[in-house]
């Protein structure tokens, strides 16, 4: 869907966005992050992008700092991994700054979280898809975080599980839709 590969340049927000959303985050396909003023707020570094993605996909629960350090720096000693995490948090807040970084990302001593009312995430829309509301499945143009493979072995394992979770949801809705269409077709044939 072309509207999700370009910055938001129209007054009508994509499905699922309301007036309180200030950042639109695309995690399916190549990662993108746009403010509502069409400013690119995607962090430059891959680790910083991965950090943003993990925090976004952890919602509505906060992402624990220890888990984030383990996912992104599994080959480093814990203290070094936590120091690297602090640097990446700083970079993430800097990148999100034009959209109100500190108001969007909550950072505490133990965890990080995104304000769900301030950030629209394409994966959230897909995960809310139902047989009655299947339109968000059209957002599935590519794999989840397809440009973030190879960051860390632990991250790669986490990413594989997340990709499977998104695929399973899409598959179950698509199969249910196909079954409904098949049943509707049989019922029309019987009524003829």
Task: Please annotate each region the language model reported.
Residues 1-23:
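Actinobacteria-biased recognition of intrinsically disordered, low-complexity terminal regions
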Residues 62-70:
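Short acidic, hydrophobic short linear motifs in intrinsically disordered regions
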Residues 89, 93-100:
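C-terminal flanking helix
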Residues 68, 92, 166:
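Residue-level signal for inorganic ion chemistry
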Residues 27-49:
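A structural micro-motif at secondary-structure boundaries
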Residues 4-5, 17-18, 41-48, 54-60, ...:
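Intrinsically disordered, charged and Pro/Gly-enriched terminal/linker segments
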